[in-house]
Amino acid sequence: MPRMFGTDGVRGVANTEDLSPELAFALGRAAATLARERSGGRVVGVIGRDTRRSGPMLAAALSAGICSAGGDVVDLGVITTPGVAYVTTHLKADFGVMISASHNPAPDNGIKFFSGDGYKLPDEVEDQLEALVKARPDTMPRPTGAELGSIRQSPEAVEAYVEHLVSTGSPLSGLRVVVDCGHGAAYRLSPEVLRRLGAEVIALNTAPDGLNINAGCGSTHPEALQEAVRAHGADAGIAHDGDADRCIAVDERGELVDGDQIMAICALDLKARGQLPNDTLVTTVMSNMGLEMLMRRHGIRLVRTKVGDRYVLEEMLKGGHGLGGEQSGHVIFGALSTTGDGILTAVQLLSIVAREKQPLSTLAGRMQRLPQWLENVRVGRKEGWEQNQAIQAAIARAEAEMAGQGRVLVRASGTEPLIRVMLEGTDMAHIQRLAASIAEVIRTELQ
């Protein structure tokens, strides 16, 4: 049987077998049971969610499960994923849970756990949760009376998170910023944080109805943000995904500034101020070679990991590095957060713009990107693609044709039925043609 936990928690279409209220209840019971076994006493779990219609349903089921196993719940309501991580540590809770499917469409949802120190759970702890959920008969405790858990709200904990974000930034007075919240978890928090720092904020897509999260807006659909930045004569634009654990930016000309460029700007700034531990940036195999070349010129070592912010974070913790992230806009500031935080990233980026007194386009222009092309191939099954001889032959042909003037990266998505084909080289038309040829073989072999 496939593992219940994927690369970013449990995901599925809400109210189906993959992500039912019954499963949420069982996961809540398992989390509280495991936490009680470790602490030997009363435990507290923090729960947050994004703006999907299924969020309150799953939060109620999860809360019921935690309480039924003798755990107390702090329900934060709508908050960002990094907000849950921060509040978990701020309240010294035993664990945190975020209900979100990030950039996925509204019918999807997910359940992601954090340990008491604010980090995502390691695989072995997720496996323990899964074993408890699947165990028959259910041997988890069922306390009664005063031993049952309770549920409370904590707006003051959410305010503590907002104050933390504000405390990390420089004054932004004089900056005009457009923020696309994608009708997601950041719809109140992101504009509020930037306004408290003094920015003039024009907020887009801040009216969630449970169904419009990520719908033609947010970080995966930046076109309206680009247009708004130009129309308002703004200094920058910021776009979040559904749970705001990442952001992308738009410069004053309406041009996209992706995660690679954001990391480049932040790494150079931190190094100049003597605050880049080990003079190292951690990123993934997807990051553009232009980032690596720029870092090398400035004496910054670039370390690559597998795709996924959890792998970036693992490498950061292992090596004692302070900055890492992904091209998609997940950026982790190790001294300020335990996970990628889109609002925090926006604050750091805009603070550099304010301090440097230079346009964002100038700062982003320090990195010259090599042409890069990504094909997402929807497949009937992902399993076994690495052993498929026809697919491997197609990859080998493309690599031979590039003759060392670029690279080919093919990988399976951890959360969707997709095989991702990424090529990087010196000529866009050439790499597009090669990517299409690999994609066609994948479609044929894995339909």
From Swiss-Prot:
Species per Swiss-Prot/TrEMBL record: Symbiobacterium thermophilum (strain DSM 24528 / JCM 14929 / IAM 14863 / T)
GO cellular component annotations of the record: cytosol
Protein name stated in the entry: Phosphoglucosamine mutase
Co-factor remark: Binds 1 Mg(2+) ion per subunit.
SUPFAM superfamilies: Phosphoglucomutase, C-terminal domain, Phosphoglucomutase, first 3 domains
Residues at the active site: 102
NCBIfam families xref list: glmM (TIGR01455), PRK10887.1 (NF008139)
Function, as annotated: Catalyzes the conversion of glucosamine-6-phosphate to glucosamine-1-phosphate.
Organism phylogeny: Bacteria, Bacillati, Bacillota, Clostridia, Eubacteriales
Gene3D superfamilies: Alpha-D-Glucose-1,6-Bisphosphate, subunit A, domain 3 (3.40.120.10), Alpha-D-phosphohexomutase, C-terminal domain (3.30.310.50)
